[in-house]
């Protein structure tokens, strides 16, 4: 009985100590008015460190400094060339500007480089490639005729290497865009890099091929022409692809390899201003970014491994008439030029180039830290690191719980029970931190208020980041304030919140690693610094000394906070402009809200619960809610209207269409004109309807049920994919088409067995045409003169078939045949439908007066990518 009394007395003393510690909680807690300072500290850190480093660009080198800075990229010279290209205007494939003027200019500039070349060290070979071909591009056959590339090979005379480094960018532009950023910027950088290579005493072992691709925008034809047909393509062992989704700023490395981590090692060793992340690669390859690059063509048809880099700053001007010289700084040219020149010298001397397949070792995990340095490791190493630190986190949490039990005298089960409750609270906070921003995105979409942040990106702070922060804080704070009888001291309870978040991240890290998602490195970074702080606190016994552990904890969270806020700030800067061209089917606010939520969870997941160090933590949450409400009120005012003239425009793609539907007997069943809109963002035609008369506009759903391809001349695979969401605005006056598109039936031959028929056609028309072919019921396409890929995979490619055709330097008509079979052998009745569209993209093609007036009436916040088009449907 004495032992029982002694044990009871000890339990009473422990309980008394705990109650005393909890009673002293309010006295020891930091005054509430310091809590805003705590939160503002992290905000100030973001603006003081992250934003300047994100915007940092090296000082441009001038031509007058070249003698004192030998071997360095000279941005001033490149900028002068950029101004020349800007003044040339749009360079549309098929126009004289692209096919002759631009080619001649490129040859002159290469000759200027040859004139200053060290002839004792280097030699230059130039080839103007003209090629025709075809390949399967998503859901269409992409055919091209006489596209042109200017190809330059630079070699060191003393080297016998037959392994080439390929550097690619494109010279053509989108209709209506000068394309100074996309991609004249990269073209002039390549020219200056070429110049620096051939005037330097530092030679390189492997020849460098500069591909000035003349047909990227229509789409990706020049790169296919080179890799499938050029005499130097078979020797290309590695690639640096240069493109742009913006104008100015830093270029981001967003794809690498695949399966060639040695390229990342050279990027780490060579790039002076690294900007890269595995997360961007996985997002891009998941199709969340509405773009494609030549990198895919070289990868799939080479295959050539490489690095895919693109300018992504100020994406508002991408593919618009505002992509001009004046929005690109000289310092941004210096940034890209220094990186490219160093990379070319590094890979140009790489021993791996002799046998790249021998160094194919799997995917890489890669990222830069604030642009200061670059980290990469192979995926297998990443798996080991992720598992090790996840397990280390779980083990140290268990050690901490045991330590709490030993110090307080509570049973391990009681401490574990408290941790279990806190884990549930942390899990609820994680769900709320993700769910509240998503809920905001859904509500704004339901109220037709998407894209309110498009021109004023700071609105995402109140719309998505603060709700996520509230979600992180709310469950833990409510638990602490409403539960008065805590078994553990307050300092330990706060540590339990961090432990719960650590366990959650460790579990997520293990799961994502198991399914092969390399972006799990983000959780590794969080775990690394938390595990380090916890280990030091346990060893130094700060773990058991009130709130002293929180000092080291916050210090160790500085670097993760800086990295995660930098990373997700970068993503928001890149992706927000893209939301206005992401299409109408998906709510773009969902993507932005997820990015904001993930950034908040990773940057503040360990830090947010620490508001409970202060008195009245609920008042902080109320204050944040008031700030969120204020932002919401601002967002539904004129400030939240998405578009602004020139700086952040609404993209409107529309065609002035003349349609004619011919029946089997030659009669015309439809002959009309109108404007066909391929809408680009979630707001659809609403902003136009508020500023101009488009009252007759109709949806195409009913047309899609009755007409092949909805009865409209969709341009390429993206237009065709979105055709059911398109709009049609009829007009009474006939659209004047500045040319003709003619389909001529040359011959119809029925086979001897009577069950097959061959139709021979000749097609004449403008630089871009599409054929849509749909066999009727009981009919099957068995052969044609196009690529057989679609016919060989009938379960993947179903009618109507889309064949896209473009010519560049040669407008000769194409002849083709279609071979079909019909189970009943009746070929004197309708067998198939064929639609022919002709697109007149160039600004040299005149728009009729009514179309010009319609374009003029568009609001000033609209950029229209438009052209006349004809569409004729025949039944044979």
What does each model-identified segment do?
Residues 5-15, 20, 36-50, 389-717:
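Alpha-helical transmembrane segments of integral membrane proteins
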Residues 25-41:
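Membrane-entry signal-anchor segments at the cytosolic-membrane interface
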Residues 54-73, 643-651:
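Ser/Thr/Pro/Gly-rich low-complexity linker/stalk segments immediately outside membranes or between
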Residues 61-377, 777-778, 783-821:
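Soluble extramembrane regions of membrane proteins in the secretory/endomembrane system
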Residues 104-141, 145-153, 187, 269, ...:
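Extracytosolic and intramembrane catalytic regions of membrane-associated proteins
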Residues 234-253, 383-407:
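C-terminal domain-closing interface element
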Residues 348-367, 428-443, 841-876:
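Membrane-proximal extracellular juxtamembrane segment immediately upstream
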Residues 358-394, 410-419:
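Cytosolic-side membrane-insertion boundary helix
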């Amino acid at each position: 009985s004495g032992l029982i009394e002694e044990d009871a007395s000890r339990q009473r003393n422990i309980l008394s100590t705990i109650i005393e510690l909890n009673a002293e909680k309010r006295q020891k807690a930091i005054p509430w008015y310091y809590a805003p300072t705590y939160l503002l500290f992290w905000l100030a850190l973001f603006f003081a460190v992250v934003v300047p480093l994100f915007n940092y660009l090296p000082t441009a080198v001038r031509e007058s400094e070249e003698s004192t800075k030998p071997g360095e990229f000279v941005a001033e010279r490149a900028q002068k060339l950029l101004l020349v290209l800007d003044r040339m205007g749009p360079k549309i494939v098929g126009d004289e500007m692209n096919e002759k003027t631009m080619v001649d200019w490129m040859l002159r500039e290469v000759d200027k480089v040859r004139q200053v070349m060290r002839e004792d060290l280097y030699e230059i070979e130039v080839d103007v490639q003209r090629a025709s071909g075809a390949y399967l591009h998503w859901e269409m056959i992409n055919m091209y005729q006489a596209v042109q590339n200017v190809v330059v090979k630079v070699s060191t005379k003393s080297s016998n290497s037959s392994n080439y480094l390929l550097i690619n960018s494109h010279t053509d532009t989108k209709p209506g865009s000068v394309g100074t950023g996309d991609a004249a910027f990269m073209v002039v950088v390549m020219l200056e890099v070429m110049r620096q290579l051939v005037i330097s005493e530092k030679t390189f072992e492997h020849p460098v091929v500069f591909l000035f691709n003349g047909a990227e925008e229509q789409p990706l034809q020049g790169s296919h022409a080179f890799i499938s047909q050029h005499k130097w393509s078979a020797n290309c062992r590695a690639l640096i692809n240069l493109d742009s989704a913006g104008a100015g700023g830093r270029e981001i490395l967003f794809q690498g390899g695949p399966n060639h981590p040695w390229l990342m090692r050279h990027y780490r060793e060579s790039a002076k201003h690294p900007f890269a992340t595995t997360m961007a690669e996985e997002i891009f390859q998941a199709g969340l970014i509405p773009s494609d690059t030549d990198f895919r063509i070289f990868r799939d048809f080479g295959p050539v491994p490489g690095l895919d880099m693109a300018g992504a700053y100020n994406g508002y001007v991408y593919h618009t008439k505002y992509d001009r010289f004046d929005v690109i700084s000289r310092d941004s040219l210096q940034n890209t030029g220094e990186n490219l020149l160093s990379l070319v010298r590094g890979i140009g001397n790489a021993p791996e180039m002799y046998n790249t397949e021998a160094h194919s070792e799997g995917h890489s995990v890669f990222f830069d830290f604030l642009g200061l340095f670059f980290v990469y490791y192979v995926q297998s190493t990443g798996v080991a690191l992720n598992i090790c630190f996840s397990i280390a986190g779980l083990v140290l949490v268990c050690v901490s719980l045991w330590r709490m039990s030993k110090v307080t005298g509570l049973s391990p089960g009681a401490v574990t029970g408290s941790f279990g409750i806190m884990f549930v609270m942390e899990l609820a906070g994680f769900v709320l931190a993700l769910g509240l921003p998503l809920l905001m995105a859904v509500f704004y979409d339901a109220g037709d208020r998407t894209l309110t942040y498009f021109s004023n990106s700071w609105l995402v702070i109140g719309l998505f980041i603060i709700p996520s922060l509230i979600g992180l804080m709310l469950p833990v704070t409510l638990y602490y304030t409403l539960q008065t009888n805590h078994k553990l001291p307050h300092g330990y309870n706060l540590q339990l919140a961090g432990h719960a978040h650590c366990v959650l991240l460790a579990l997520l890290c293990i799961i994502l690693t198991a399914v092969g998602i390399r972006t799990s490195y983000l959780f590794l970074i969080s775990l690394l610094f938390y595990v380090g702080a916890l280990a030091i606190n346990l060893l130094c016994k700060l773990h058991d000394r009130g709130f002293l552990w929180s000092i080291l904890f916050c210090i160790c969270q500085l670097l993760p906070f800086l990295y995660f806020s930098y990373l997700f700030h970068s993503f928001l800067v890149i992706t927000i402009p893209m939301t206005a061209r992401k299409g109408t089917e998906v709510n773009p606010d969902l993507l932005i809200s997820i990015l904001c939520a993930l950034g908040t969870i990773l940057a503040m997941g360990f830090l947010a619960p620490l508001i409970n160090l202060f008195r009245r933590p609920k008042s902080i949450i109320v204050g944040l809610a008031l700030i969120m409400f204020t932002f919401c009120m601002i967002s539904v005012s004129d400030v939240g209207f998405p578009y602004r003239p020139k700086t952040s425009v609404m993209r409107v793609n529309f065609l002035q269409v003349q349609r004619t539907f011919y029946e089997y007997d030659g009669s015309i069943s439809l002959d009309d004109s109108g404007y066909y809109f391929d809408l680009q963002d979630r707001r659809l035609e609403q902003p136009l309807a508020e500023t101009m008369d488009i009252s007759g506009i109709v949806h195409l759903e009913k047309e899609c049920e009755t007409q092949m391809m909805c009865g409209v001349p969709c341009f390429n695979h993206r237009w065709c994919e979105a055709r059911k969401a398109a709009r049609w605005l009829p007009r009474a006056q006939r659209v004047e088409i500045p040319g003709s598109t003619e389909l001529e039936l040359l011959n119809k031959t029925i086979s001897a067995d009577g069950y097959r028929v061959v139709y021979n056609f000749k097609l004449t028309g403008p630089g871009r045409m599409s054929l849509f072919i749909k066999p009727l019921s009981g009919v099957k396409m068995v052969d044609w003169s196009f690529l057989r890929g679609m016919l060989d995979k009938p379960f993947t490619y179903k009618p109507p078939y889309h064949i896209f055709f473009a010519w560049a330097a040669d407008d000769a008509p194409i002849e083709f045949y279609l071979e079909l079979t019909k189970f009943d052998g009746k070929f004197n009745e309708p067998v198939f439908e064929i639609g022919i569209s002709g697109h007149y993209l160039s600004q040299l093609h005149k728009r009729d007066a009514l179309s010009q007036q319609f374009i003029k009436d568009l609001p000033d916040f609209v950029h229209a990518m438009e052209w006349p088009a004809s569409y004729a449907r025949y039944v044979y």
